[in-house]
């Protein structure tokens, strides 16, 4: 089987969630079949074709025209490959659908949010999403639920905890609350500032792995409240360096704010499969994140991780204090969380699921 993966707005390799998704999917599919990736213009790697540019238009029609303009080169690059099936990340805005028509190849489209072309949805033989209500009702019958995961070889449980803490400047008796990811408003990082302000113990420290547009605001607030010394910021890191830094944490948190995330706000609940939570658990870290329907379909509160009501800083603080006060129970919870991720929620498991879908699509074509 020859699989063409179309994700022309995503840089590979990169240091954000989209890059992680595409890189890990590409690696997983490549273990099963000959796979070619059409990626953003600044991408690199074997079997990776740098092609698309960041889509700067806000209107869908202009984004679709941008993607259509890539078709001649995309067709030339894919012609010698002769794909049997095509996977389109929805934010490629129809380029995968055009290639599907050109090569008469079955199309699978991934729907993440409202960034899609109806051409991709209508042309697709199959649609996949981490929540089926993300797929418009008119084409939802073609939908199949999928889950993302973690690279459990990279986010391993046996990385050097002591060395990472020493490198970050933490002492042996510090209790370190970790976060990894982007610093956007919907990631809810202001909640960690509030936690620091209410939990005044100087031995409670915060490890912030990543960067983003809200970082200056966060640092300014920390300065105003006299909390700067309790936070360590690593800045943006290559994906492969994140596990070696994050291992220094004693508990990891994903304090999302669904009210700042448009698709989640519209549906009244957080809609994404949060990669960072899978990664935290893969490293066997006690994890705390928000209560959301899709998370409850994967994890059990208190068995695999701790959940709190979105926006409730008091409840978040209570969950973190529980980890601090119940170290043995928290460690057992983290071990169960890791076992669940290893069994069901790895990137290779996701790629294998898609490969089975491709086999069904080819058999039906």
Regions found by a protein language model. Give the residues of each.
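N-terminal subdomain of nucleotide-sugar transferases
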Residues: 1-44, 81, 105, 365
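Short His-centered aromatic/hydrophobic patch
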Residues: 88-93, 111
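Conserved acidic donor-binding segment of nucleotide-sugar-dependent glycosyltransferases
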Residues: 274-275, 299-313, 322-327
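Carbohydrate-associated surface elements
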Residues: 133, 148-149
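Nucleotide-activated donor-binding/catalytic signature segment of Leloir-type glycosyltransferases, i.e.
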Residues: 217-246, 251, 261
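Conserved donor-binding/catalytic core segment of Leloir-type glycosyltransferases
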Residues: 4-6, 171-196, 207, 251
């Amino acid at each position: 089987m020859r699989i063409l993966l179309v994700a022309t707005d995503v840089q590979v390799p990169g240091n954000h969630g989209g890059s992680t998704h595409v890189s890990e999917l590409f690696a997983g599919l490549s273990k099963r079949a000959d796979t070619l990736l059409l990626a953003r213009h600044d991408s690199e790697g074997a079997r990776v074709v740098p092609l698309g540019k960041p889509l700067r238009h806000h209107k869908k029609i202009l984004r679709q025209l941008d993607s259509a303009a890539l078709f001649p080169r995309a067709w030339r690059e894919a012609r010698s490959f002769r794909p049997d099936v095509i996977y389109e990340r929805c934010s490629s805005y129809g380029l995968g659908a055009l290639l599907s028509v050109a090569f008469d190849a079955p199309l699978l489209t991934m729907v993440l949010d409202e960034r899609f072309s109806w051409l991709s949805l209508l042309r697709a033989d199959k649609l996949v999403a981490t929540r089926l209500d993300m797929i418009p009702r008119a084409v939802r019958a073609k939908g199949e639920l999928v889950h993302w995961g973690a690279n459990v070889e990279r986010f391993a449980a046996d990385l050097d905890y002591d060395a990472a803490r020493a490198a970050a400047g933490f002492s042996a008796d510090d209790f370190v609350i970790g976060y990894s990811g982007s610093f956007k408003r919907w990631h809810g990082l202001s909640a960690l500032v509030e936690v620091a302000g209410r939990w005044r113990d100087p031995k409670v420290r915060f490890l912030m792995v990543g960067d983003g547009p809200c970082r200056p605001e966060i640092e300014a607030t920390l300065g105003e409240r006299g909390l700067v010394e309790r936070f360590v910021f690593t800045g943006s890191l290559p994906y492969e360096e994140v596990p070696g830094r994050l291992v220094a944490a004693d508990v990891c948190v994903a304090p999302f704010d669904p009210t700042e995330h448009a698709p989640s706000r519209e549906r009244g609940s957080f809609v994404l499969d949060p990669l960072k939570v899978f990664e935290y658990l893969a490293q066997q870290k006690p994890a705390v994140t928000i209560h959301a329907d899709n998370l409850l379909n994967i994890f059990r509160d208190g068995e695999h991780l701790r959940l709190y009501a979105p926006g409730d800083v008091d409840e978040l603080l209570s969950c973190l204090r529980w980890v601090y006060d119940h170290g043995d129970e928290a460690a057992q919870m983290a071990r169960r969380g890791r076992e669940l991720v290893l069994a069901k929620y790895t990137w290779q498991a996701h790629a294998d699921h898609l490969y089975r879908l491709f086999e069904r699509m080819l058999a039906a074509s």
